[in-house]
A protein has these predicted regions:
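A short, active-site helix/loop in glycosyltransferases that binds the activated sugar's phosphate group
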Residues: 112-182, 363
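Catalytic binding pocket for nucleotide-activated donors in carbohydrate/polymer assembly enzymes
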Residues: 274-354
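A charged, aromatic-enriched C-terminal amphipathic alpha-helix characteristic of glycosyltransferases
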Residues: 335-389
Length: 390
């Protein structure tokens, strides 16, 4: 099959943009399944992200395609992921290729983001861009597993179709391996763990830095046998001057001891190599995250509350900061001595990669169902990262 996947490579580095990573990982997986796969991009600017994408496409045998070239390729399926496909554009492509199918691949919590936009007037840039486009009604909507609970039926509502289903989660070690090859990061080497990194973007309640900071502060207060040299709030530079935020941070013993600092968002390899020996994370209704897989694949400890990947890193329950404290304490105390961690983590994470041939086959079946107009809603199994018809 000829498959096109939209990607926006005009702004963010691949190491920071989860959506662009998702597009490339999906393209690699579909290529593994024997499909002729293209990344469809809008802009062709000389940016760091574009350079990264060109190199990775060349290395892994992926094709790039401009939007105005889509009609000539006679694609069987176009997957809208990084860039929304308008109904006008879709109709133009259908005029030249009546059998073309459209899939909307959803990897963001649109319900939360829309609610925050309407109630708190946040995410205004996104709202403005979306208001300019009427998206095509897709032949199917695919949701990543962590969005299923809050968004599956919301996607049906906003896109005007009942053909919405969960699909397996995809990750790939390619970016971490590229960072290793270029010496941007190294495998965790057993060094003493005394620098903590928190990497929540702080643009939505879904990923907010205060809960993991509370967990780290509890360890600092209650466990004097653990040395914490620094707590880095990566991605908190946009809120660090907010009065309420400063009030919350000011209550923390780590802050009073001069051990906290805030910085802009950075790529995971950069943080792991330069600033953090361990990552502490918190999420709400986003229980799978590339950050956890990136860090664990490199052998670093990552403490998180994502229930769909409990066997990745070190898991604590939901909003239970006492449990988080216990888990972080044990990780800081014992991780350096765990010689099996790297191999075990890579074994656990493999189910999310194109090395999982069962997942490769499942995506081919899902594609064929769309082409044949045979929609089937799927049920997700987090232990195997697989789906089966409901």
């Amino acid at each position: 099959m000829k498959i096109g996947i939209t990607i926006d490579i005009s702004r963010l580095s691949l190491f920071v943009s989860g959506i662009n990573q998702n597009a490339i990982y999906l393209a690699l997986l579909l290529k593994e399944g024997g499909n002729d796969t293209y990344l469809i991009h809008v802009k062709d600017q000389d940016t760091k992200s574009l350079d990264q994408t060109k190199k990775l496409c060349k290395k892994h045998g992926l094709n790039r395609l401009a939007f105005n070239e889509v009609s000539s390729k006679k694609l069987d399926v176009v997957i809208s992921l990084g860039v929304t496909i308008s109904d006008v554009m879709a109709n133009a492509w259908r005029n030249k290729n009546p059998n073309i199918k459209f899939i909307s691949y959803k990897c963001g919590n649109e319900f939360f983001v829309d609610a925050e936009t309407y109630i708190y007037k946040t995410h205004q840039e996104r709202a403005a861009s979306h208001s300019k486009i009427t998206p095509v009604i897709p032949d199917a909507v695919w949701s990543i597993p962590q969005m299923e609970n809050t968004n599956l039926h919301y996607y049906s509502f906003i896109l005007g179709t009942e053909n919405t289903t969960v699909v397996p989660f995809i990750w790939d070690p390619m970016l971490m391996e590229a960072a290793l090859e270029s010496n941007e990061v190294s495998i965790y080497d057993g060094r003493k763990i005394n620098r903590i990194g928190i990497m929540e973007p702080n643009i939505s309640l879904m990923k907010f830095c205060i809960p993991p900071a509370i967990i780290a502060d509890r360890v600092f207060k209650n466990h004097k046998d653990i040395e914490i040299e620094k707590l880095m709030l990566i991605g908190a530079n946009g809120i660090q001057n907010d009065l309420k935020f400063k009030e919350l941070i000011g209550k923390m013993e780590l802050y009073k001891a001069g051990k906290m600092s805030a910085d802009a968002r950075h790529a995971t390899p950069f943080i792991l190599d330069k600033y953090a020996h361990i990552i502490v994370s918190w999420q709400w209704e986003n229980p799978l995250n590339y950050l956890y897989l990136d860090a664990a694949w490199l052998g670093y400890a990552v403490v998180h509350n994502a229930h769909l990947c409990k066997d990745v890193g070190y898991y604590y329950e939901g909003f239970d900061f006492e449990n988080g404290e216990e888990v972080l304490y044990n990780a800081m105390k014992n991780h350096a001595e765990d010689s099996n961690y790297l191999a075990e983590q890579r074994k656990n994470i493999t189910r999310y990669t194109r090395m999982n041939q069962n997942m490769v086959k499942q995506y081919n079946i899902l594609l064929q169902d769309v082409v044949n107009d045979e929609f089937k809603r799927q049920v997700y199994d987090p232990l195997t990262n697989s789906v089966s018809p409901k």
